Curated annotation (Swiss-Prot):
Assembly and oligomerization: Identified in the spliceosome C complex. Associates with U4/U6-U5 tri-small nuclear ribonucleoproteins (U4/U6-U5 tri-snRNPs). Component of the minor spliceosome, which splices U12-type introns. Interacts with SKI, SMAD2,SMAD3, RBPJ, RB1, PABPN1, MAGEA1, SIRT1, FOXN3, U2AF2, DAXX and ATP1B4. Interacts with PPIL1. Interacts with VDR and RXRA; preferentially associates with VDR:RXRA heterodimers. Interacts with NCOR2. Interacts with MAML1. Interacts with NOTCH1 NICD; the interaction involves multimerized NOTCH1 NICD.
Ranges of compositional bias, category Basic and acidic residues: 470-489, 503-530
InterPro entries registered for this protein in UniProt: SKI-int_prot_SKIP, SKI-int_prot_SKIP_SNW-dom
Keywords, in A-Z order: Acetylation, Host-virus interaction, Isopeptide bond, mRNA processing, mRNA splicing, Nucleus, Phosphoprotein, Spliceosome, Transcription, Transcription regulation, Ubl conjugation
Highest taxon in the source lineage: Eukaryota
Residues bearing PTM Phosphoserine: S14, S182, S190, S224, S232, S234, S446, S479, S481
Region span, SNW: 174-339
The protein's name in its UniProt record: SNW domain-containing protein 1
Amino acid sequence: MALTSFLPAPTQLSQDQLEAEEKARSQRSRQTSLVSSRREPPPYGYRKGWIPRLLEDFGDGGAFPEIHVAQYPLDMGRKKKMSNALAIQVDSEGKIKYDAIARQGQSKDKVIYSKYTDLVPKEVMNADDPDLQRPDEEAIKEITEKTRVALEKSVSQKVAAAMPVRAADKLAPAQYIRYTPSQQGVAFNSGAKQRVIRMVEMQKDPMEPPRFKINKKIPRGPPSPPAPVMHSPSRKMTVKEQQEWKIPPCISNWKNAKGYTIPLDKRLAADGRGLQTVHINENFAKLAEALYIADRKAREAVEMRAQVERKMAQKEKEKHEEKLREMAQKARERRAGIKTHVEKEDGEARERDEIRHDRRKERQHDRNLSRAAPDKRSKLQRNENRDISEVIALGVPNPRTSNEVQYDQRLFNQSKGMDSGFAGGEDEIYNVYDQAWRGGKDMAQSIYRPSKNLDKDMYGDDLEARIKTNRFVPDKEFSGSDRRQRGREGPVQFEEDPFGLDKFLEEAKQHGGSKRPSDSSRPKEHEHEGKKRRKE
């Protein structure tokens, strides 16, 4: 006997056996499909592991009690899913009617504009169409009267319903109806073929309470349809649009409770400074223009000063060369033994020029005096030969010397003197003058020296210390300065334009601020140098 006869039958099939059984089942189903396409549950004994899922699995029967799974034959007991999805509707051309979404919950007579053509104005093909004509006066009056009656009826009903006690409603007028019965004969309807029926509304009791309750909550009607969105089809966003839609988070400039490390660019983006338009004040442009003009003028002034310095250096160089040339010429003439009379002639010409210049000044002075007013003319004539000193030193006699003999005016018209016999003939007494020559106060002291009695209250007892002039004298003087010089003789003499400033101003006026002087100014320069050389 084989060993397999003693072993129990296997409960599980091998892979080969499963494949063979599947192949046989497919063949059987193929054979049965040719006969009948009806699907039925497997017979008893072969339902292990089988679960009915579809409606065809139940066949014509109900649920299988031996299969402990929720079963819904013919979908009985299955909860229906609630959905607000609408069934797709198409129009006569086969296009989907998207306006069904807007028409949901609305009456069929309500006009809803949901197409692009609704936005486009219609073209009037026939101007005489009666639908497009304006109503006449009779139609307007009729419609107005109907509207007024309907509104009055609605308002009266509302007012009457709100009143607690109201009068009885007016009865409608009686209506007469001609009635013809269907059964005609002597036995029916008392032998009458027609009857006239008078119909009257039954009178109502005004104190009768309302029969129907109307205080129930009526469900709210559907809302207004959503506005149709007429836009182009959606397109993919670009990178630039995505970056523009990035909204920076709200970052405080004062609080950071969590202690996060926030980059500076994110903090500035949250601040919103980049979103503000920058308005530049027009004064910045004015300031920049003013600075540019000032810089340009400063450069022009520097360049002009440099030109003036170069011209002065050139003139100095030319003067030095001319001097060296004259010295060389004199040395050559001295060696050759030739006597020159150039200096003598130059000296005579210089004297003649000075005389001409003085006479010209006198004539100009006379013309000015003749043109002046009478009071001013007398004042000029009075101060014509007046000598005004430069300074008045305090307590110092005038050091100016004069060639004229000066007399003391106090000696004249006196009863004493040499003619009176020297004090009555007493030779031993030398008192020719009754008082000292310098005993009286000088005019400068009377002008500038304050009186003690009047100014004592203001300045105090230290008046002598205040009026001393020693405090204005430096303790250590500069080298080369000698304060004990002799007084100058004659009026003050000034040098004539040592720096060439007048000449520079004349050139600037002539050329009108041009950067480079023209050649026409050179003769004037030589003429000015000649005048200066003659005055020297």
